[in-house]
Amino acid sequence: MTNNAAAPLYSLRGLPLIGWRDMSHALNYLFADGQLKQGTLVAINAEKLLTAEDNPEVRALIAAAEFKYADGISVVRSIRKKFPQAQVSRVAGADLWEALMARAGKEGTPVFLVGGKPEVLAQTEAKLRTQWNVNIVGSQDGYFTPEQRQALFARIHASGAKIVTVAMGSPKQELLMRDCREVHPHALYMGVGGTYDVFTGHVKRAPKIWQNLGLEWLYRLLSQPRRITRQMRLLRYLRWHYTGDL
């Protein structure tokens, strides 16, 4: 019998990643026995592994997160290559966030949203309430000063939020989650990058067929040619993958 409340770990470049079989497995893992886990979720793709390799501070932030999972198809393929018996599938961060929000709405779990432009954040809140009746207990757009961080942490703590999602891009969101947990430790934190923009339709995500083929990165590159410099970095990751240096 499969235990959906547990998940194996697979190490890439010294970082242990959770191997979820699918979205259902991920949700059952995070809500094991009806209790939402506490800690930090970090989506891992090839670009983030490269950054962690070159930036000790980013690596420390990622290493400290309890729940590191394979968000990028290249990472999933590397796990399968290194561990042939691994039953792991890609769980995209944007999809996991939506699934968490739907589950939170069903369970009445209090949610605090951080990040994004004011108008995008407002639209995100409205859509979450309408679509899944999410219990949003507070929010803060991404435009606040370093001096206002402690006040934000106090608000999050006072709200009693059990899920805190932060859309500020990496590594800003990981830094904020790390510091906020010192004030409000009993919650599940999730860095979500540009997910609010996608959720509200301000940014178009790759069509499903591109996602299913593992070509979402190519769709983004064709849509945003300026990403070519970032994509060129991935040649280094490909070398790791094909030489078994993971």
Swiss-Prot record:
Q: Which residues cross the membrane?
A: none
Q: Pathway, per UniProt?
A: Bacterial outer membrane biogenesis; enterobacterial common antigen biosynthesis
Name one matching Pfam family: Glyco_tran_WecG
Top class in the EC scheme: transferase
Q: Does the keyword Glycosyltransferase apply?
A: yes
What are the GO MF terms of this UniProt record? hexosyltransferase activity; lipopolysaccharide N-acetylmannosaminouronosyltransferase activity
Q: Quote the catalytic activity from the record.
A: UDP-N-acetyl-alpha-D-mannosaminouronate + N-acetyl-alpha-D-glucosaminyl-di-trans,octa-cis-undecaprenyl diphosphate = beta-D-ManNAcA-(1->4)-alpha-D-GlcNAc-di-trans,octa-cis-undecaprenyl diphosphate + UDP + H(+)
Could you mention a single GO BP entry for this protein?
enterobacterial common antigen biosynthetic process
The alphabetized UniProt keywords are: Glycosyltransferase, Transferase
Enzyme Commission no: 2.4.1.180
Q: What NCBIfam families does UniProt report for this protein, alphabetically?
A: PRK03692.1, wecG_tagA_cpsF
Question: What does the UniProt record say this protein does?
Answer: Catalyzes the synthesis of Und-PP-GlcNAc-ManNAcA (Lipid II), the second lipid-linked intermediate involved in enterobacterial common antigen (ECA) synthesis.
Which protein family is it in?
A: Belongs to the glycosyltransferase 26 family.
HAMAP family for the chain: WecG_RffM
The name this protein carries in UniProt is: UDP-N-acetyl-D-mannosaminuronic acid transferase
